[in-house]
Amino acid sequence: MHLVRWLICLIQLWIQLGAAGSVTLLDPLLIEIPNGKLRGRDNGHYYSYEAIPYAEPPTGELRFEVPKPYKQQWTNTFDATQPPVLCMQWNQFINGTNKLLGVEDCLTVSVYRPKNSSRNNFPVVANLHGGAFMFGGPSQYGHENIMREGSVILVTIGYRLGPLGFVSTGDADLSGNFGLKDQRLALLWIKQNIASFGGEPENILVVGHSAGGASVHLQMLREDFSKVAKAAISFSGNSLDPWVIQQGLRGRAFELGRIVGCGQASDSVTLKKCLKSKPAIEIVSAVRSFLVFSYVPFTPFGPAIESPDAPEAFITHHPIDIIKRGKFSQVPWAVTYTTEDGGYNAALLLEKQASSGRELIVDLNDRWFDWAPYLLFYRDSMTTIKDMDDYSRKLRQEYLGDRRFSVESYWDVQRMFTDLLFKNSVTVSVDLHRKYGKSPVYAFVYDNPSEVGVGQILSGRNDVYFGTVHGDDVFLIFNVSFVPANRRPDEEIISRNFIKMLEYFALSTDDTMAYGDCVFQNNVGSKHMQLLSITRDGCENKQLNFFI
């Protein structure tokens, strides 16, 4: 009799678990989705299901096209134990002259599910990786920190990068934004399939850092974003940053064609056909020809404003115009920056040149008017060279006065980079959203320097104080290889608070957001900018005036 009761209870429990998804009691590694069955890996305190295709390979005739949903039916169990591959890229953080990484067939998602005996279902965090729209990948943003906390399912996404993902002639024939369209399809995949992994499709939070943060904002500017996500966070990147929506993309597209042997193309149709015939390695390796020095500008290929008649156009107006018209998804959004975000890419100016032994920053004294428009992304937005030179002169006077560029004046150069490339746009975007939006808008600034970060990596030195640079906050959420595994006690606390913040935001039933003991203040309806300051000592809500 007891055996019968036990079996009945077991069956009831199995039914309850089955109703929540396809994670079975007997074999949680075996998942069934519309394409068939897949098997993941048991990693001790979490399960992983990696490199699951969400789109057909963007190769051959599908190169430079809107991604097609993955339709293949698996006759055998799909092996989801292999790590995700990188999309083909010219990677800034590879030493040496050959910076080529990855493959063209790369449109996959990876799902990480914690083992947690206290819950069967989890809120979901979908991460769009950063990398200037040019490099990076899901495998470079580690999942161990989030899995350690055991409170959310994490999904990472691979999407096309560089010229393969963002080349554009500005018309319907080669519209661009293929990487953004990949992201969109992946988010739809998550919404439709995450319940099979024990995720809660009604509690999906989309986050991203740098270009990933800008991607999150661009995704949110589509009115249908609320169909795939509940809330969003843009860390140190949003669509109003000057390196996101750029002019001059059409010229770069045809220059790319000339470099790879499509110089005879005089129209978009011919150019596209020719580029499809070229090896992907040649197209991606051509990135080096668009760099003035080192990895400057860091985004030669990025998002474009598409023609309204482009196939499945992603964005057809400038983000500012979209926000002012109120034609964007009304979901809670948080946007952030670090106090010295401009350490990317300013720190590379402190690298000592092998030939002369002096820092690149010294060369700015003679090359400022040549390099500044590329470093700060106004090369294609000025009408005349005089306008460009006048602006370059104004910036130098504002931040350095009469001082020369040197190691001693580096801090002010970095401050310039922080303001122009990251910080100013946070104020502008929050101001616009509070005026023209309805859903809550939150903001925070992080000020707590890491022992090793982007500043040290780019400059190759540890004798300079960089402050809290680009990534110092996010790298406490997504562990990366160059950040020390042994974090300070204050960083451990902050890491846990950040991850708890993600869970809280994903689960919130009233659109509120909290970090530690601090509740974020909503900017909508506020006369002042509501900014949460996060430091090693805790958190504090501050009010600022809305001006640049």
Curated annotation (Swiss-Prot):
Single GO term (MF): carboxylesterase activity
Predominant subcellular localization, coarse grouping: secreted
SUPFAM superfamilies per record: alpha/beta-Hydrolases
Cleavable signal peptide: 1-19
E.C. designation(s): 3.1.1.1
Keyword Secreted among UniProt keywords: yes
Domain of life: Eukaryota
Keywords carried by this UniProt record: Disulfide bond, Glycoprotein, Hydrolase, Secreted, Serine esterase, Signal
Enzyme class: hydrolase
Glycan-carrying positions: N95, N116, N479
Active site location: S210 (acyl-ester intermediate)
Cystines in this chain: C87-C106, C262-C274, C518-C539
Keyword Signal found: yes
GO cellular component: extracellular region
UniProt catalytic activity: a carboxylic ester + H2O = an alcohol + a carboxylate + H(+)
Location(s), subcellular: Secreted
A Pfam family that the UniProt record links to this protein: COesterase
Family stated for the protein in its record: Belongs to the type-B carboxylesterase/lipase family.
Name the UniProt record assigns to this protein: Esterase-5A
Source organism (scientific name): Drosophila persimilis
Gene name of the record: Est-5A
